[in-house]
A protein has these predicted regions:
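An aromatic- and histidine-rich active-site surface loop
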Residues: 87-111
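Conserved donor-binding/catalytic core segment of Leloir-type glycosyltransferases
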Residues: 147, 190-217, 229
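Conserved acidic donor-binding segment of nucleotide-sugar-dependent glycosyltransferases
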Residues: 309-310, 314-321, 330-335
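N-terminal strand-loop element at the rim of the active site
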Residues: 7-11, 18, 23-68
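Short hydrophobic beta-strand element within catalytic cores of glycosyltransferases
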Residues: 294-297, 307
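A short, well-ordered alpha-helix in the C-terminal region of glycosyltransferases
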Residues: 323, 330, 337-351, 360-363
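Aromatic "clamp/platform" in nucleotide-sugar-dependent glycosyltransferases that forms part
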Residues: 258, 277
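Carbohydrate-associated surface elements
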Residues: 152, 173
Length: 373
């Protein structure tokens, strides 16, 4: 099949999943064309059967804001004609599904099929805004197929937008071998040390509640020698740094910044903290589990579908830093307990093997192509 993929060119979960999906599809023999506003972080090298096409932006004096959605639709039409695309798989209903549908109707002779994957904020934040609500619902209803990355997100989309069409639940995925493989010498240097290592990985948006990470760590430090690695960057990083100073743990907290490859640094972790206010899936939790790292997170969104409470980690109410600290100590305070959680984490992560999940997407592509005949 000849498949176009559009996603955000960021280090967030949707961009990671979309890029890795495209690479796996290419290895399976499909032709894949990525179309985005900028270079994709997980596509530093262009593999065989993969092409990348940037949707350029231009300034125009009559327009206060550049119409990126229209420009993207035009680029999709151009690439679809050049690469003879059959499928457009867009990750996020807004803005990408709307642009893909615009392209589909602008070039009906191409008979493009639009597959939309809902990742979370396109439903819970952007799409529910009254400004975007009608177009979000339209984009979902008009797509040839729609998937959601968790059952929770599926249910939210149906409830929030009164969706009548079927939505397939297709979970995010990992490559278990890639996470299991040791990587000596390629771990980014970190300047602090400790007996156990807690880790947080995110884009440091307020919804990630990074200050709660620091609060949990400060409580753990009262009982264990530990360090905290804060991986990523974003608007809430400064507040988390200041809180570490205020709580007297700054010398044990390292702000590592953004890393392109997550597997090497996960090999340093004994526990992942993910105290988010909402998570539609929680890809970083799955990546941690695949690396044998138990997870203490919040009982929100799709996280209970990933983290098995009491087996691969624990789930606490949002903002309950005392409960999260107690759970962290329960796992970290006994090596045998930690080993049991680590082994269970690896085992559960295998349920999200890319071979199974990519096969589900291929079946959806074949279904929408068959529907046109």
């Amino acid at each position: 099949m000849r498949i176009g993929i559009t996603c955000y060119p960021t280090h967030g979960g949707s961009g990671v999943v979309a890029t890795e999906l495209g690479k796996h599809l290419a290895r399976a023999g499909h032709e894949v064309a990525f179309i985005s506003y900028a270079a994709l972080l997980r596509l530093s090298e262009i593999p065989e059967r993969v092409s990348f096409h940037e949707a350029e932006g231009y300034s125009y004096p009559l327009l206060q804001n550049y119409p990126h959605g229209v420009a993207l639709a035009s680029k999709i039409v151009s690439v679809a004609r050049m690469r003879h695309l059959q499928i457009l798989h867009v990750h996020y209903a807004i803005p990408f599904a709307a642009s893909a549908l615009m392209a589909k109707y602008a070039a009906p002779e191409l008979d493009l099929k639009v597959v939309t994957t809902l990742h979370g904020t396109d439903i819970t934040l952007v799409g529910s805004d009254p400004t975007f609500r009608p177009i979000t619902r339209w984009a979902i209803e008009q797509s040839d197929a729609v998937t959601a990355v968790s059952q929770w997100l599926h249910d939210e989309a149906v409830k929030e937008f009164a969706i009548r069409r079927p939505i397939d639940v297709v979970y995010n995925f990992i490559d278990p071998e890639r996470h299991a493989r040791p990587c000596p010498g390629c771990i980014p240097p970190v300047s602090c040390s400790g007996e156990v290592t807690l880790m947080h990985i995110s884009n440091f948006r307020p919804v990630k509640r990074t200050e709660d990470v620091v609060r949990v760590f400060a409580r753990v430090r009262e009982h264990l020698e530990a360090r905290l690695l804060m991986v990523g960057d974003g608007p809430a990083a400064g507040a988390a740094q200041q809180l570490a100073v205020d709580l007297g743990v700054a010398d044990r907290v390292c702000f590592v910044g953004i890393v392109e490859q997550i597997e090497p640094i996960l090999q340093q972790a004994d526990l992942l903290l993910l105290p988010s206010e909402t998570e539609s899936f929680g890809l970083v939790a799955l990546e941690a589990m695949a690396s044998g790292v138990p997870v203490v997170a919040t009982h929100v969104g799709g996280l209970p579908e990933v983290v098995s409470h009491g087996e691969t980690g624990f789930l606490a109410p949002v903002g309950d830093v005392d409960a999260m600290a107690a759970y962290a100590l329960q796992i970290l305070g006994d090596r045998a307990v930690h080993r049991r959680f680590a082994d269970a984490s690896r085992e559960r992560a295998r349920l999200f093997d890319y071979r199974e999940i990519v096969g589900q997407y291929e079946a959806i592509y074949e279904r929408v192509l068959w529907q046109s005949h």
